[in-house]
Amino acid sequence: MALSKIDTAGLAADAVDNTILDLTSNYAFTGTITGAGGYTQGTKVSPTSGTTVDFTGIPNNVKVIHILFDLVERTSSAWGIIQLGDSGGFETTGYTSSVGYPGTGNTYTANAAADTNGLKFWYYGATKHSGIATIMRFSTDQTQWIMSSRCHAADSQSYSCYSAVERTLSADLTQIRITMASGAYSSTGGDINILYTS
């Protein structure tokens, strides 16, 4: 049978002032809460032209970063790419990567020369895409990062894309770039934003 009340006589005295805990009271707490602090959300960007979107000023204690895409479109078909950057600029080569997507004959590409310039997250142009890329710190400092992404076509084309990448930087990660091999962001817009946590 379910209990409908708590027998306060069975509660142990607390460790503060040796009084019995009163469940009807409103307690005030003081001090500083430490540990995981939740996510910080960036400022949403809605690109309608140009080739790059940059998120800068990433704090030096970040461990996990999410990049969110909603109905983003480009003018032509070519790889959309995510690149990491530190105080010396953006890293445009040296990524160990693989990407799988159902292109012609269910194409699968793994660590080809053309795939060392960043995380590939979608291919087709003139098609709206939505997805998420996750960037996680692998090392105790802020230099070694693992990235993965999942993206799908939101209209027209019917396909999805999955990627994984590793990159070690020469200094702490401070910025992220979303760019493309060719073409530009479409005038139809769409939204890109970033979330990160320590």
Predicted regions, residues:
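Surface-exposed molecular-recognition determinants
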Residues: 35-198
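Fibrous stalk/shaft segments of extracellular and virion attachment machinery
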Residues: 1-44, 48
